[in-house]
């Protein structure tokens, strides 16, 4: 299902959205699924429409991130990808009720998150539950962050499109 646009397919009462990046077919999954009035967004990362990592971390000789200065840029691009997927279902970040940030460096993530989350959600106190979890590895060596989202539609938004 390769494409540069957010594609969608409906099967068994589930509506799926894709970004057209290579790993969707390689791994075999949808970027987001809408069931009823709930949208589940799979782990998003900082990539462009062709699947190239945005603001990749520099790596040390062992192939691990040498520093975490790109955390803010990666976080911002990750939220932008989530916005694209949510829009496919008529939702925005205002509909997000829970997010989980998986990060390689908790301190760098905390330093970036205060600013980026407030900008992304457009408020000083985003109205969603948020989890920040330190992990030892993500999908790509240069990747510093991955975020999953759960969003709820209500009223007119929940009607089939």
Regions found by a protein language model. Name each.
Residues 1-80, 84-97, 103-161:
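N-terminal presequence-like segments and the immediate start of the first folded domain
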């Amino acid at each position: 299902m390769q494409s540069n646009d957010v594609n969608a397919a409906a099967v068994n009462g589930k509506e799926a959205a894709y970004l057209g990046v290579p790993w969707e077919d390689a791994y075999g999954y949808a970027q987001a699924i809408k069931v009823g009035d709930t949208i589940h967004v799979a782990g998003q990362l900082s990539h462009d429409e062709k699947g190239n990592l945005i603001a990749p971390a520099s790596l040390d000789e062992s192939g691990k991130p040498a520093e975490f200065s790109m955390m803010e840029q990666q976080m911002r691009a990750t939220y932008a990808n989530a916005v694209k997927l949510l829009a496919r279902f008529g939702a925005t970040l205002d509909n997000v009720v829970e997010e989980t940030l998986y990060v390689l460096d908790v301190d760098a993530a905390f330093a970036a998150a205060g600013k980026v989350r407030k900008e992304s959600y457009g408020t000083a106190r985003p109205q969603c539950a948020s989890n920040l979890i330190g992990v030892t590895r993500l999908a790509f060596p240069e990747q510093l962050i991955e975020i999953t989202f759960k969003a709820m539609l209500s009223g007119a938004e929940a009607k089939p499109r």
